[in-house]
Amino acid sequence: MKLLYIDLFCGAGGTSTGVEKARLENEQCAKVIACVNHDKNAIASHAANHPDALHFTEDIRTLNLSPLVSHLQKCRAEYPEALIVLWASLECTNFSKAKGGQPRDADSRTLAEHLFRYIEAINPDYIQIENVEEFMSWGDLDEYGKPISRDKGKSYLRWLDNVRSYGYKFEHKILNSADYGAYTSRKRFFGIFAKGSLPIVFPEQTHSKKPDQKLKNWKAVRDVLDFDDEGKSIFGRKTPLVDSSLLRIYAGLIKFVAGGKDAFMVKYNSMSKAGKYNAPGVEDPCPVTVSYTHLRAHET
């Protein structure tokens, strides 16, 4: 085993599953040994998929690190050549532009600061961070919980310097999941801290919206949608759809069906600045979805 991962903010285990699918010369090269999440349902799901990992249903800010350190020592003894990776998919809601003009939770925006005690206790070889692009704009908030424009990015840069002070170098990239064969288009910040002379390597792009001889075309979400499941017709409803929902469907009919297509997506927050709805198609990757289900596939 080349890499041993500790997954903070592990959720139901998407990152952990990706880590353990990694292969080097057709052999598994990475293993998730421990994970932390405050949500018991997320941990239950993670444990079902990764039963060999040590699970902590705790807030990362208050977790007693002694059991984690003890477990890590045992894993290091079993895999003495393995490098230790601390992965943190920091809570992103209060950085994201999807938050709009709403106030931010100042406490949530400081979760990255709580990584320092993990760094000191674990001394990882690598630290890998995933978040929304706006993480780089992290700065102070005013009395109303709104970002102060003149302080944009100051907290982020200060945090970077603090992590570097532990002997790490740092690189980051903004990567789109669709560029790596996913059925969704989602841009995210990925940052890698590496100790000493350890290399920092990002994956090579495999797909593109405009492919060439080296890159494949983006994958169409149509390929993973079950159009045999017709759902419920919008006609004959006890309560008719509101006008905004009908306008979103109408926009898709005009954009796609009038042009000969038989299916399209309806997205809740799809209105442009000009006040027009822009329906996504099914021949492209799915646009970003959120925890509440405001994305639908429509077939004529």
Where are these regions (language model features)?
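Active-site donor-binding loop signature of nucleotide-sugar glycosyltransferases
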Residues: 58-60, 177, 291
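Core alpha/beta nucleotide-donor-binding catalytic domains of modification enzymes
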Residues: 2-122, 132-150
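Proline-centered helix-kink/hinge sites
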Residues: 90-91, 124, 132, 183, ...
